[in-house]
Amino acid sequence: MISVDRLSEEQALGMKEQEWAGPEALCPGWQEEEVSDGEGPEDSGHPDPTAHAYEVLQHTLRLEGMPLTIDRTGQPRTGSGPLDMTVCVLGSPTAFLPVLLEGGTRYPGAMVLCLAPAWASRVPSETSPGSWSLLLSRGVSFEAGGCTALEEFVPPRRATYVTGTFGSEGSWEGELARDLDCPTGGSALLTRWLEDPLLSRWLLSARAGLPVPPTLAFITGLWETLPEEPEPPGVHLVRLQDPQGQESLVRDEVGAFLEGSSMQPYDQVAVRLSGWRWRGTDPHSTHRKVEGEAVAQAVAALLKGLREEESILLEALVPTARLPTLPPRSAAPRLPMALRICTVVCRSWGDRPQLCQVACTAGRAEVPVRHGSALPLGLDSSLRQWGLADAAQRQALAGQLREAAEAAMAALLAAEGELSPAQRGGARAHTDVLGVDFLLACVDGTLELVALSANCLRCLETCLLAEGMGHDVGQPAGDVPRLLAECLLHRAQCHLVEGKDILLIGAGGVSKSFVWEAAREYGLRIHLVESDPEHFAAGLVETFLPYDSREHRRDEEHAERVLEMLRARGLRPDACLSYWDDCVVLTALLCQRLGLPGCPPAAVRLAKQKSRTHQHLQRCRRGRPPPAAFSVPCRRLRSHGDVERAAGAVPFPAVAKLEFGAGAVGVRLVENAGQCHAHAAQLWHDLRADADHPGIGLGWGNAMLLMEYVPGTEHDVDLVLFEGRLLGAWVSDNGPTRVPTFLETAATLPSCLPADRQAQLVRAALRCCRACGLRHGVFNVELKLSPAGPRLLEINPRMGGFYLRDWMRAVYGPDLLLAAVLLALGLPPVLPSRPAPRQQLAGVMCLASEHGRALRGGVMAALQGLQRRGLVRLNPLFEEAGGRYEEPCLSVACAGDGPAEACGRLLGLCQALGIDSPQYPVGHFLSHFK
């Protein structure tokens, strides 16, 4: 907590007396003619609500400097198919306008605004019995640059995600969105559930553990939506069987509440009606705590009109913390003020809550500050104005607010998940965006955030108003439209892949077990081609196609045999992909023959053969710098004669490794030609066929290459490319390897490098991939960052292996596997345009030769216990096997707010469990991560 006593004596200008706008809401500029609280076109009272809504949209676009909507209804839009994404927003033309404009830029044509019930229809779902599909025959579509078009859709477009302004009871928006077969961001029922202050306050206290104003609630009926659990701190419930004749009970309960310990710090209370009808309204009355009889009378008076699922709340008026200030410049008395903090939180990747924006509104302290009662400010500016001069304290409070807002959404989503589909308005209805209001109070000398309630649109309106005001004075665009557009588009893409038939080539080992869980999560129908007829994944897929393709020099023949198997079973896959090194060329051949998106087989072959990759890049001399600048001198080795010739062209020390290898198996630093001869002889004797060491490319033979040794730090760059366009890039750092074998020891994500050095790595990786013809897919590029800049080690024409997919989800959110599936379907995946890490991960590899005995002796059980508590991340990699060509068996990682914290936790854990030793110095392996 932040202590009031620690506040700096430095103080900004004293708060001036302000004029208040009164009870009417000040909506954003794009809502000047719009009814607040999410009311749609039918609620406007206009004789032709659809025409009025369209006029409001044009007026708003004009004010925002956007081109007016083009009418294309005379030329119906045709050709929509099962892979077309349609994010449909029902109702108000302005409540989601910034999100629609952002989504139109990110994914042109996918965002569609429906202004009237006649523009859409419901038909029984073909995939979900008992549900409905929403078909759009007309809508306003959003394109890049703020362009919009009124369009007719022939045939009607099927919505893949639906949200809207689910306002008054029985509204057409709520009826159209009920029981749909696609994800629905809210519903009329969920809106009424979320907007009830009593219910949200109960959940914020009980499930999120947040302080709430002391509240006494009088309810009637059963209230089925209230959780069946003990009363949470701060909320006391009084159930009235009959609202009439309860004056004595009300008087006793009110008296006990006012005199109770929870009310000791407070002097005033408010009496309000709670329920859907009363959302966003002012309190019915406010009283001093000592006016017990008047308070009881106010409560009793409201009981007469109380409906089922409504309540009367008696709540403490929690004052905003009064911070030490310098004497004001004016001699006029300073009035007590109140501060309301609005937060907007969305369901981000992996269903994790993410705070999008914060805006604050100030007002006089006599009554609670309403949404829209004044122009908002940012959190930092508001805290400075309030007297919090210390920047570190403001930053700490902002961090506490983020944690509280995200915990609030997590609690509300968990409670929402306990509702039945009928209570939610459909099996696919979930809240994806919500607002949570807070007060800043002072409790026992420390600043404390007090949660008030949740809402659907009011916090969003306030935050969008704040963004619009910032735009007026030249501030860069805020995060709300971008984050919400990404949220909606991502949810729609997850629905698009449901039920798709995916031809997967190669199952991989234990390190790829996550694929089968992900397939269930995304609803994929996996048809697996695998060389091992006894593979454990055989029972986890839709179709298991055992076929021995390990001799990869015959991949052309294998492709024909696999096609025959597909035809014999009547399988027509929607996509074909592989994440297993050995199978990438066969996958490219199958994509080519099936007419499915993917990279050309020649490009994949070029990347798979390491010496050809570098020799090709050395011939690429166009560009500044050209791709040749990132290549490294190397020579192919198929005989000892090749070793002699390579020794004359490649300077020593050099690196000798398998031409088609994977997992650093057989990689070795050699100081001279003699060492290279010895290593080649040993490797050619030990590793001759795939059976000698499965999964490391021996199906192409055991040729080697000799490559110049590049000094510097090692890094992985994971790229997502759609038809040559870069959609996403992430850089991770590797620790110093165990020379001379170069086996990976440690890693961290995100990279500790400065942004400009990361940009060097990303651009080098991108130039190398494009130069090799890899323009469509998820690729993992290994580079060294030398004093002279990036140098390529190798390109893996598949997504990153080991722990990378898991770490990427934990740190940034997006799923590389889902991105690979979408690209294989021919769709550009929606990824964060400005990825921000949620945490730092640092991990260390475990080896059977070093740690096998400890792992079998109880260390593994201890690690699994820590993983269940969320204290470590474990990624099993390979079965325990030591020997000359050992691979890591386990990755152990810890999280922190930065590299120092993550590495400190990991080192302490490794020392405690015996993973760290003089022979395996974890501290040294982590030393690069600063």
UniProtKB/Swiss-Prot annotation:
Protein name, as recorded: Carnosine synthase 1
Enzyme Commission number(s): 6.3.2.11
Single biological process term from Gene Ontology: carnosine biosynthetic process
Catalytic activity from the UniProt record: beta-alanine + L-histidine + ATP = carnosine + ADP + phosphate + H(+); 4-aminobutanoate + L-histidine + ATP = L-homocarnosine + ADP + phosphate + H(+)
One MF term in the entry's GO annotations: ATP binding
Coiled coil (UniProt feature): none
Ranges where the record places region Disordered: 1-24
Binding site for Mn(2+) 1: 782, 794
